[in-house]
């Protein structure tokens, strides 16, 4: 077995974008990772710089613990000439309420007690 294939991770095909459902022209839901054997959705804001044409540099804006998708971040980067995507990785929607198919919350229990559940392949 060649060295390059011995340690090659088995990753999904990242060239395929996740399934997406647009709410309006600046926000969307996209397919998240499977969590506890169920499909999840992620809410995000998206924006393009005014007058963009063709390829555009982009920023992916990931909030810290307890954060959310911040539309202000998207606008700030759009004003600087970047496409921007700000997602809510705590399983919440634009109103801050939990999505019925959102991923794990950002609370203490979800972050730290999940380690006690045991590992699976």
Predicted regions and their residues:
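Cytochrome P450 heme-binding "Cys pocket" and the immediately downstream C-terminal segment
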Residues: 1
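N-terminal cap/lid segment of alpha/beta-hydrolase-fold proteins
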Residues: 4-54
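Solvent-exposed loop/turn segments at secondary-structure junctions
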Residues: 35, 64-68, 91-94
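Surface-exposed beta-strand edges and their flanking turn/coil or helix-capping segments
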Residues: 40-45, 57, 73, 99
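Short beta-strand element of the alpha/beta-hydrolase
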Residues: 43-46, 54-64, 84
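Short, charge-rich binding segments
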Residues: 50-54, 67-68, 75-78
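Cap/lid segment of the alpha/beta-hydrolase catalytic domain
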Residues: 71, 75-76, 80-121
């Amino acid at each position: 077995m060649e060295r390059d294939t011995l340690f090659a991770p088995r990753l999904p095909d990242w060239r395929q974008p996740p399934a997406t459902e647009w709410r309006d022209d600046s926000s969307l839901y996209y397919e998240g990772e499977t969590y506890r054997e169920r499909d999840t959705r992620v809410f995000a804001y998206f924006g393009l710089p005014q007058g963009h044409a063709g390829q555009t540099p982009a920023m992916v804006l990931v909030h810290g613990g307890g954060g959310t998708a911040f539309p202000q971040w998207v606008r700030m980067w759009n004003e600087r000439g970047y496409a921007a995507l700000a997602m809510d990785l705590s399983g919440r929607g634009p109103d801050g309420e939990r999505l019925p198919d959102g991923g794990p919350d950002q609370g203490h229990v979800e972050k730290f007690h999940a380690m006690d559940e045991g590992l699976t392949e």
